[in-house]
A protein has these predicted regions:
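Internal alpha-helical scaffold of NAD(P)-dependent oxidoreductase catalytic cores
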Residues: 30, 156-187
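Phosphate-coordination loops involved in phosphoryl transfer and adenosine-cofactor binding
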Residues: 5-8, 86, 114
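Rossmann-like NAD(P)(H) cofactor-binding subdomain of soluble oxidoreductases
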Residues: 93-154
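Hydrophobic/aromatic beta-strand patches that form the interior of the parallel beta-sheet core
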Residues: 33, 75, 90, 140-142, ...
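Short beta-alpha connecting loops at secondary-structure transitions
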Residues: 34-37, 152-158
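NAD(P)+-binding Rossmann beta1-loop-alpha1 motif at the extreme N-terminus of oxidoreductases
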Residues: 1-52, 59
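A structured beta-alpha segment of the ubiquitous adenosine-cofactor-binding alpha/beta core
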Residues: 56-110
Length: 190
């Protein structure tokens, strides 16, 4: 079920949303690198995912082999450089524009020009986030709803510079993850 053109996924932020998004991508067969400024938070996120999977196995909702395979696809990243070869980056960090713009500028310098850089933001302008990014056509919003593993809807948010091809690629990826993509323009509250 893995979307091959976006084979490796990186998730930045390991709170509730970041962990849920990492679980969704790993469940779809992607190797997932998880980065957080607090390395212990990444370990806690993976432990939380393991606990939720164990509960599903105990209830007969998931085979233990599937749970083990999903967990084996989750990899802690100890610095942003470890995300350099990701095909898709999903940022789920602090909802502060200055944090996101600095982070996306760093990612643009580290990752290949073909890497799709996305934010899970629900309120910050994608156009503003992309303003300082080389190749801003690859920047988009990928807004999951909480809890990400359960909720089917994902907003694919385009900024002024986001290319149609990037939006299409993200919609195909999200559909491959069993989610329902909804295309949105970057406006207040989408």
């Amino acid at each position: 079920m893995m979307t091959t053109s976006l084979a490796t996924v990186a998730v930045i932020g390991s709170g509730t949303m970041g962990a849920g998004i990492a679980e969704v991508a790993a469940a779809a067969g992607h190797p997932v690198r998880i980065f957080d400024i607090n390395p212990k938070a990444v370990d806690q996120a993976i432990e939380g995912i393991a606990g939720r999977l164990a509960s599903r196995v105990a209830r007969g909702k998931l085979a233990s082999e599937q749970a083990d395979a999903l967990l084996a696809r989750l990899h802690p990243a100890h610095d942003l450089a470890a995300l350099a070869d990701a095909d898709l980056v999903i940022e789920a960090a602090s909802e502060r524009l200055e944090v996101k713009t600095a982070l996306f500028a760093q990612l643009a310098a580290i990752c290949a020009p073909s890497t799709l850089l996305t934010s899970n933001t629900s309120s910050i302008s994608i156009t503003a986030i992309a303003a300082g990014v080389k190749n801003p056509e690859r920047v988009a919003g990928l807004h999951f709803f909480n809890p990400a593993p359960v909720m089917k809807l994902v907003e694919v948010v385009s900024g002024l510079a986001t290319s149609t091809e990037v939006v299409e690629q993200l919609c195909q990826c999200v559909s491959g993850w069993g989610k329902q993509p909804v295309r949105c323009r970057s406006t207040p509250g989408f």
